[in-house]
Amino acid sequence: MNLKNKITTVLLGLFLTTVSFAQTAKPTEYLGIAGQILFDKTSYNLAWTSHPTDNYYKQEYLVKGDIIGKFKKLVLLEIITGKTKLKDVVAVKVTELKKIKASSPIVNYETFEKDGEVMLDFLVSENTPDGKYLSIVERNVYRYKSIIDKNGRKGILLFGVSERAYGDDIDKFFPNLKAHRFDLINLVGAFEIPEITIAK
C-alpha cells in the first residue's frame, strides 16, 4: 500500500464529518484527554471514538443534547502516527474536495498556512433522496499540525470544528457564514490543543 492510499484509508477529516455509528458503550479515550473540551466557552463531551488501524485515532465531542449524525456543532481530534508528512495529509483531503466539487458546485474550500501548521476551511453538503434540495450543509474548519506526544510518539494531529444546518435552517446558514466566516477560523487557530498521550 503506497503512502497516498494509506492516508486515504485513514483520511483525517472524512467527507460529511460523521458517518459514525452510535456507540452504546462508553467511548474509549485514546488520546489521554481528561474530561471535556472547552471550546469558545462551551463544554463538549466525548461522544464517539474510533481506532480502526494501528496508526489512526479519532475522537468526536458534542454538547449535551446533541447526537452523532444530527449535531449542530461538533469538535473532533484525529491523529495519524508515524512518518506521514503534514503536507501529504492535507493534499489528500484537498484532492478529495476537488473531486466532490466537480459534481457538487456548493463545495468550497480554502487553505491557510502559519507557523508550520495548515488550516483548511471547507463547505460540503448532502441532498434530499430525490436530489432536488439540500438536506444538510456542513462547514468545517480543520487545523493540522505535527506533534510529539508525552511518550515521544510522532504524528499528524487534526483539530477540527464542524457546524451543520438542516432543512429550512439552511437558508439562514449561508448569510450567517458570510457575515461571520472568520470568527470560527480565528477560534480554531487560537485554540490551545490539549496535551496528547496516544494509547499504545
Regions found by a protein language model. Name each.
Residues 1-11:
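Bacterial N-terminal signal peptides that target proteins for export
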Residues 9-19:
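Bacterial N-terminal signal peptides
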Residues 23-54:
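N-terminal "mature-domain start" segment
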Residues 67-70, 127-136, 167-169:
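Short, cysteine-centered beta-strand-loop-beta hairpins and adjacent loop/turn segments enriched
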Residues 71-110:
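Mid-chain, structured segments of secreted extracytoplasmic proteins
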Residues 153-200:
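Surface-exposed amphipathic alpha-helical segments
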